[in-house]
């Protein structure tokens, strides 16, 4: 029996698609809420339903790639702590299914591609997509995540251990 998943499945795991789906639901709801307010004359604008659909599709593609790429970069950075947690020890890098270099190249590439997709729509969307990727990688992953327990989330209370909290906690 081969427990080693295909490269495609490894890429999907690196992207943390379950988390990305939640982000995308929020994004699509925001687009729809905006356009419904426009149609109700609560705010100004004149986008058609076809343009709304286009905005949703661009957001789904670009947002999934950008967020998925930043998640892959996060896994590269967390490769030293992932083997020690039950929730993360089965990830592709700790299992040796993919190299750190390959994972980083994948993450950076799809982050840039995701942000580039927004160029089809508006330069401001490109800016905010890249800002989000950089914020997640540098501010959350590298700077904040290991410095405070207030950012720690876990699906199970048993995963919350004092070893993950700063000594001042």
Locate each region found by the language model:
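Membrane-embedded alpha-helical segments that form the functional core of polytopic membrane enzymes
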Residues: 33, 41-75, 111, 127, ...
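Helix-loop junctions at the membrane-solvent interface of multi-pass transporters
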Residues: 33, 120-121, 142-143
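C-terminal ends of transmembrane helices
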Residues: 136-148
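Conserved small/polar residues in nucleotide/adenosyl-binding loops
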Residues: 152-157
